[in-house]
Amino acid sequence: MEQDGDQLSARPALETEGLRFLHVTVGSLLATYGWYIVFCCILLYVVFQKLSTRLRALRQRHLDGAAAALEPDVVVKRQEALAAARLKMQEELNAQVEKHKEKLRQLEEEKRRQKIERWDSVQEGRSYRGDARKRQEEDSPGPSTSSVIPKRKSDKKPLRGGGYNPLSGEGGGACSWRPGRRGPSSGGUG
């Protein structure tokens, strides 16, 4: 019986010794490599999350492909819908191209007509710019809010005389200024 009591008392001592050893080993390991272990765990978690979502998507595509292979009607309907959408988009694009071509053709026709009118007016001896103004006035009869009324220039007096130039010495002013000579001054060295 004594032997059994010694074994029982010896066993807890061994267990406590093992726990101390484990505590010291794990504590020193965490003290030296603790942050590395934490960062590695976080990195593994993130990588696992990314791979699991990709794996799920890959499985889903595989299952969809298998289901589509089993149901050819679904594939045919999908292809028909795709072809119809492409055809509709092409028709819209063709309509836009036709509208653009029509606009360009109208602009070219207008330019050609204006050139012919200018040529005719030049051949007759008229100014084509004056004719263009008259045509504009004829095209928009009545008062226009956006048009600017030209001011009369004859009512205003000119601010200066016609030939006044302060740098040349001509015109109004009692003194006349002339620029100096560019050469060396006379009477100097040289």
From Swiss-Prot:
Ubiquitously expressed. Highest expression in liver and lung, with lower levels detected in spleen, kidney, brain, lymph nodes, small intestine, stomach and heart. Very low expression detected in longissimus dorsi. Signal peptide: none annotated. GO terms for biological process: cell redox homeostasis; cellular response to lipopolysaccharide; cellular response to oxidative stress; endoplasmic reticulum unfolded protein response; ER overload response; negative regulation of acute inflammatory response to antigenic stimulus; negative regulation of endoplasmic reticulum stress-induced intrinsic apoptotic signaling pathway; negative regulation of macrophage apoptotic process. The gene is SELENOS. Residues 115-190 are annotated as: Disordered. The modification Phosphoserine is found at S140. The chain crosses the membrane at residues 28-48. Its main location: cytoplasm. Interacts with DERL1 and (via VIM motif) with VCP, suggesting that it forms a membrane complex with DERL1 that serves as a receptor for VCP. Also interacts with DERL2, DERL3 and SELENOK. The SELENOK-SELENOS complex interacts with VCP. Residues 115-138 have a biased composition (Basic and acidic residues). Belongs to the selenoprotein S family. Residues 160-174 have a biased composition (Gly residues). Involved in the degradation process of misfolded endoplasmic reticulum (ER) luminal proteins. Participates in the transfer of misfolded proteins from the ER to the cytosol, where they are destroyed by the proteasome in a ubiquitin-dependent manner. Probably acts by serving as a linker between DERL1, which mediates the retrotranslocation of misfolded proteins into the cytosol, and the ATPase complex VCP, which mediates the translocation and ubiquitination. Keywords: Cytoplasm, Endoplasmic reticulum, Membrane, Phosphoprotein, Selenocysteine, Transmembrane, Transmembrane helix, Ubl conjugation. Truncated SELENOS proteins produced by failed UGA/Sec decoding are ubiquitinated by the CRL2(KLHDC2) and CRL2(KLHDC3) complexes, which recognizes the glycine (Gly) at the C-terminus of truncated SELENOS proteins. Truncated SELENOS proteins produced by failed UGA/Sec decoding are also ubiquitinated by the CRL5(KLHDC1) complex. Residues 78-90 are annotated as: VCP/p97-interacting motif (VIM). This is Selenoprotein S. The keyword Aminoacyl-tRNA synthetase does not apply. InterPro entries: Selenoprotein_S. One of its GO terms (molecular function) is antioxidant activity. It holds the Pfam family Selenoprotein_S. It is a single-pass membrane protein.
